[in-house]
From Swiss-Prot:
This is Eukaryotic translation initiation factor 3 subunit L. Belongs to the eIF-3 subunit L family. It comes from the Eukaryota. It is found in: Cytoplasm. Residues 306-514 form the PCI domain. GO terms for cellular component: eukaryotic 43S preinitiation complex; eukaryotic 48S preinitiation complex; eukaryotic translation initiation factor 3 complex. Component of the eukaryotic translation initiation factor 3 (eIF-3) complex, which is involved in protein synthesis of a specialized repertoire of mRNAs and, together with other initiation factors, stimulates binding of mRNA and methionyl-tRNAi to the 40S ribosome. The eIF-3 complex specifically targets and initiates translation of a subset of mRNAs involved in cell proliferation. Component of the eukaryotic translation initiation factor 3 (eIF-3) complex. The eIF-3 complex interacts with pix.
C-alpha cells in the first residue's frame, strides 16, 4: 500500500515561523514549522506509519518497516540521522507509542549508519527508550494491544542485545576518552546498559509470555493456549518471549557462560524445526551461538550437526532474505563464520558430513587450512577462531582508577586462551590416529618409534598418556533426544577404537562406509527436473 516509490519526491527545508506567546498558537506554529522543514515524502511516510501502527494493520506496517523505511534511509539519511523526536512528535500528535517505536529505529539507524558511531548521550537515550518500551508492555496490568510484525520484534530484541554489546565495548576502550568522560561513565552512567538490566528485561519478557510453558505444552502434544495466560495468548507477547530466549542465548555466549547459554533454551528442541523458527535471521543466529557453545564445551559432534543443518538451510533458502541487502550481508557473514567453526570441529573430531557442505569446503579452499591444522599449525587454529568467534564482552566496566588502556580485547583473548589450551592438548592426536589406522595390532614400542625414532622407555610411558588422551578426547557427550540440549550420552566419535593388552595395541576400524546411493538419487532427480524445464521452454 505504501511502497517506496510513493515517497520518491523531495521538498526543500525552510523556516518561516515565529512564536507568539500563545500556547495554542505556538503549538500550531511548531507543528507547521517542523512539517515545513521536513521533506514531504518523509512527512507522509511518518504520518502513514503512525496511522498503520494505531490501526494494527500488520501488512502495511511490515511493508513500510521492511521496504519503505530502508529506501528513505538510503535516499535521505544515508550518512545522517533521521529527524529528531520533537520534529516527528509535532506531525504525529505526540503519539507516545509511535514515538517510542520511532526512536528505536532512529537510534538503530545511528548505530548502523553514522560514521564514528553514536555519542555517549545517544547511547544513554537509546537505553532509556528501550526502558520506556519494555516498561510499557511489561508493567501494564492488562496486555497492551499492539501489533508488530515478527521480523520487527526479532530485530528489536536482537538490536537491544547488540547495543548492550556495543556499549560494553565502548566503555572498555579508555584510550580514546578523557578523564572527565571516564568519570562520567563510571559515576553518572554506571547503571545504564548494565548486564543486570539486560538479563532482567529478557527474563521478564520470557516470564510474562509464559513461553517456556507454551513450548513444553507443544512438546507434550497439549494446547499451548491453556497455559499461555492473558499476555502469552497474544502473538506480540509470545514472539517477544521466544526471541528473548534467543537473546539470552546470545548474552550468555558473549559472557563466555556456555552451559547457561544452552540451558536457557531448554524448552526449545534445538535440533528440530519449530513453528517459531520462521524468521531466517533468528534461526541462523540461534544455530550460530548454539554451535559455538557446543564447540567450546567440547561437544564437537553436536556442534558439527548444528552447523551442518543450518548451513544446508542457508543454501536452500537464500531467496527468503536476498531482497534485503543488509540482512543478506549479515547472514552471509555469519555463514562464513560457521564454515570456519565447522572446519575447526572437523579437524578436532573427524566425521562424515553432507556432501554439499563438503563441496563448499572444497570450493572455498578450507581443506588447505584444515590440513595445516591437522599437522598441528596453531596459528591457523588461532586465525580461524578469531575470525569466527562472537565479539565477547566483560559484564563489568574497567575500574575508575584503571590504567588508560584498551580493554576491549581482554574477554576475547581469555576465550582464545581457553580454546588454544584445548587445541594444544589435541594437536598430536591426528598423527596418532593416522598410524593406528594402518594396523589391526601394533606394539607400543613400534608406535613409539614411529612417532620418535630415538624413543626411550620414558617415551613409551608418555605414549600411554597420549593414547589415554586420545580415548578421552574422542569420547563426547552427544545429544540424542529430549528438549534439553545439555543432555546426551557419551559416544566415541573416532573412526577407530582400540584397547591395550600388555604391550600390544588392538585396533578396530569403526568407520561407516559412505552411502553414495542417496547422493546419486538426489542428482538424478535434480537432472530430471532440469530436463523437464528445458523441454517446456518454447524457442
Amino acid at each position: 500500500m505504501y511502497g517506496g516509490d510513493e515517497y520518491a519526491n523531495n521538498s526543500e527545508y525552510y523556516d518561516d515561523y515565529a512564536h507568539t506567546g500563545d500556547p495554542q498558537l505556538d503549538m500550531e506554529y511548531e507543528r507547521n514549522y517542523y512539517a515545513a522543514r521536513m521533506p514531504d515524502n518523509v512527512k507522509y511516510f511518518l504520518i502513514n506509519f503512525c496511522q498503520a501502527i494505531k490501526e494494527g494493520n500488520l501488512y502495511d506496517i511490515q511493508n513500510m518497516y521492511e521496504n519503505t523505511f530502508p529506501q528513505i534511509s538510503d535516499h535521505h539519511f544515508d550518512k545522517t540521522a533521521w529527524p529528531e523526536e520533537q520534529e516527528v512528535a509535532a506531525i504525529v500528535d505526540n503519539d507516545k507509542v509511535f514515538l517510542i517505536l520511532y526512536k528505536e529505529l532512529y537510534y538503530r539507524h545511528i548505530h548502523a549508519r553514522i560514521s564514528g558511531g553514536p555519542k555517549l548521550e545517544q547511547r544513554i537515550n537509546s537505553f532509556f527508550n528501550y526502558c520506556d518500551f519494555f516498561n510499557l508492555i511489561i508493567s501494564a496490568q492488562n496486555p497492551v494491544m499492539l501489533e508488530l510484525p515478527d521480523i520487527w520484534l526479532w530485530e528489536l530484541v536482537d538490536e537491544f542485545v547488540y547495543q548492550f554489546q556495543n556499549f560494553a565495548q565502548y566503555r572498555a576502550r579508555l584510550t580514546d576518552k578523557s578523564q572527565d568522560e571516564i568519570q562520567q561513565l563510571c559515576v553518572n552512567h554506571s547503571n545504564e546498559w548494565s548486564i543486570l538490566c539486560i538479563l532482567n528485561v529478557l527474563h521478564s519478557l520470557v516470564d510474562i509470555s509464559n513461553i517456556k510453558k507454551q513450548l513444553e505444552a507443544i512438546s507434550q502434544g497439549s494446547d499451548p493456549q491453556t497455559v499461555a495466560g492473558d499476555f502469552g495468548k497474544l502473538s506480540f507477547y509470545k514472539m517477544l518471549g521466544y526471541f528473548s530466549l534467543v537473546g539470552l542465548l546470545r548474552v550468555h555466549s558473549l559472557l563466555g557462560d556456555y552451559y547457561q547459554a544452552i540451558k536457557v533454551l531448554e524448552p526449545i528442541e534445538i535440533h528440530k524445526k519449530s513453528a517459531y523458527s520462521h524468521i531466517p535471521a533468528c534461526q541462523i543466529s540461534t544455530s550460530y551461538y548454539v554451535g559455538f557453545a557446543y564447540m567450546m564445551m567440547r561437544r564437537y559432534a553436536d556442534a558439527i550437526r548444528t552447523f551442518s543443518d543450518i548451513l544446508l538451510y542457508i543454501q536452500r533458502t537464500k531467496q527468503l532474505y536476498s531482497t534485503r541487502s543488509y540482512q543478506n550481508d549479515q547472514i552471509n557473514k555469519q555463514a562464513e563464520q560457521m564454515y570456519h567453526l565447522l572446519a575447526i570441529c572437523l579437524v578436532l573430531h573427524p566425521q562424515c558430513i553432507d556432501e554439499s557442505i563438503q563441496q563448499v569446503l572444497r570450493e572455498k579452499n578450507y581443506h588447505d587450512a584444515m590440513f595445516k591444522m591437522q599437522c598441528g599449525d596453531l596459528e591457523v587454529f588461532k586465525s580461524f577462531f578469531v575470525f569466527a568467534c562472537p565479539r565477547f564482552v566483560s559484564p563489568c566496566p574497567p575500574a575508575a582508577d584503571a590504567p588508560m588502556e584498551d580493554y576491549v580485547k581482554d574477554p576475547m583473548e581469555h576465550q582464545l586462551l581457553v580454546f588454544m589450551d584445548e587445541v594444544r592438548q589435541q594437536k598430536d592426536l591426528p598423527t596418532t590416529r593416522s598410524y593406528l589406522k594402518l594396523y589391526t595390532t601394533l606394539p607400543l614400542t613400534k608406535l613409539a618409534s614411529f612417532i620418535d625414532p630415538n624413543a626411550s622407555e620414558d617415551d613409551v610411558s608418555k605414549l600411554l598418556i597420549r593414547l589415554l588422551c586420545f580415548k578421552h578426547k574422542m569420547r563426547n557427550l552427544v545429544w540424542s533426544k529430549g528438549p534439553s540440549g545439555l543432555e546426551g550420552t557419551f559416544k566415541s566419535g573416532s573412526e577407530l577404537d582400540f584397547y591395550i593388552d600388555d604391550d600390544m595395541i588392538h585396533i578396530a576400524d569403526t568407520k561407516v562406509s559412505h552411502r553414495y546411493g542417496d547422493f546419486f538419487v538426489r542428482k538424478i532427480l535434480k537432472f530430471n527436473d532440469l530436463n523437464r524445464k528445458l523441454k517446456n521452454i518454447n524457442i
